[in-house]
């Protein structure tokens, strides 16, 4: 037999998957080769999937579709809330520190905690914002402690005085900022400032007036007049009218009259110290009547003496 021999030429290589590469006519980039081989094998039936792969894929598709729908409908937070609460992350304890005027109940109500709130789903920044809206809260720190505790650390505002504006009473800071309405006698020992703009000028005047502690203990209220000066309303009803400027001079005059004549213990209604060259003392209506009676009696006595002469 004769052996048939063809002309010797270039060898053609056949890869394992049965696809012959062209004579360097086209070569796939390396990153694409594995994917193409997978698709060819898949089409040729050499790759088989487990029996339940289709069911699992369909279920995964349905779950993904549901999550996408919840996201579009804004229900993601509700779903996370329910699922994580059921998993044992419900908020069961709220630890509050640094609070003197803010109660734990105030914080629970502000956060809307009802026993089913999830710690995982709780928005810390939103919790800080909500607690910060409480009247006494200056700063707040909120921290999650898993599995079911919130730690709240407060720094509260400090009440400096009471401000009366019209018929309303409010607690104020040194800056004059209103903290909250006055609702009980807990702060009765704080100084009372009355009038428009009194809250913003209160701290500076009160600090200056601390130079005369013997008078400060007598003051029932510091009354702001026309946004320029102060009147002192004393515990016994006497009103001391201070000048707009040079309060120290006026208080020095008042101190001298008190030491010499015990002026503030007398039956007077007001002491006017607004003018530098004079001090005016206003009597009470009862004192005025007594003075009129005394003057009339004195006139009668003088007339009687003249007749005798």
Swiss-Prot record:
It is found in: Cell inner membrane. The chain crosses the membrane at residues 53-74. Residues 1-52 are cytoplasmic. InterPro entries: Cell_div_FtsQ/DivIB_C, FtsQ, FtsQ_C_sf, POTRA, POTRA_FtsQ_type. It is a single-pass type II membrane protein. It comes from the Bacteria. Gene3D superfamilies: Cell division protein FtsQ/DivIB, membrane protein fhac. Essential cell division protein. This is Cell division protein FtsQ. The gene is ftsQ.
């Amino acid at each position: 037999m004769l052996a048939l021999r063809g002309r010797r030429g270039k060898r053609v290589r056949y890869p394992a998957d049965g696809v012959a590469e062209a004579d360097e006519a086209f070569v796939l980039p390396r990153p694409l080769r594995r994917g193409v081989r997978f698709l060819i094998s898949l089409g040729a039936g050499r790759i088989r999937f487990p029996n339940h792969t289709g069911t699992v894929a369909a279920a995964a598709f349905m779950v993904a579709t549901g999550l996408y729908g919840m996201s579009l409908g804004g229900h993601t937070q509700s779903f996370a809330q329910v699922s994580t609460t059921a998993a044992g992350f419900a908020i069961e304890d709220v630890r509050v520190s640094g609070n003197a005027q803010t109660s734990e109940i105030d914080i629970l109500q502000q956060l809307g905690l009802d026993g089913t709130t999830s710690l995982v789903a709780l928005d810390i920044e939103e919790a800080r914002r909500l607690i910060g809206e409480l009247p006494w809260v200056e700063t707040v720190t909120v921290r999650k402690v898993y599995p079911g505790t919130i730690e709240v650390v407060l720094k509260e505002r400090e009440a400096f005085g009471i401000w009366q504006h019209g018929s309303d009473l409010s607690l104020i800071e040194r800056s004059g900022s209103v903290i909250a309405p006055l609702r009980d006698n807990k702060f009765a020992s704080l100084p009372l400032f009355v009038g428009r703009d009194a809250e913003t000028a209160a701290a500076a005047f009160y600090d200056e007036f601390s130079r005369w502690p013997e008078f400060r203990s007598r003051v029932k209220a510091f009354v702001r007049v026309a946004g320029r000066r102060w009147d002192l309303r004393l515990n016994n009803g006497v009103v001391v009218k201070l000048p707009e400027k040079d309060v120290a001079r006026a208080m020095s005059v008042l101190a001298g009259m008190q030491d010499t004549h015990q002026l503030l213990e007398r039956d007077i209604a007001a002491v006017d110290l607004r003018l530098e060259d004079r001090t005016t003392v206003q009597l009470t209506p009862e004192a005025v009547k007594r003075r009129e009676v005394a003057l009339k009696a004195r006139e009668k006595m003088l007339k009687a003496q003249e007749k005798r002469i």
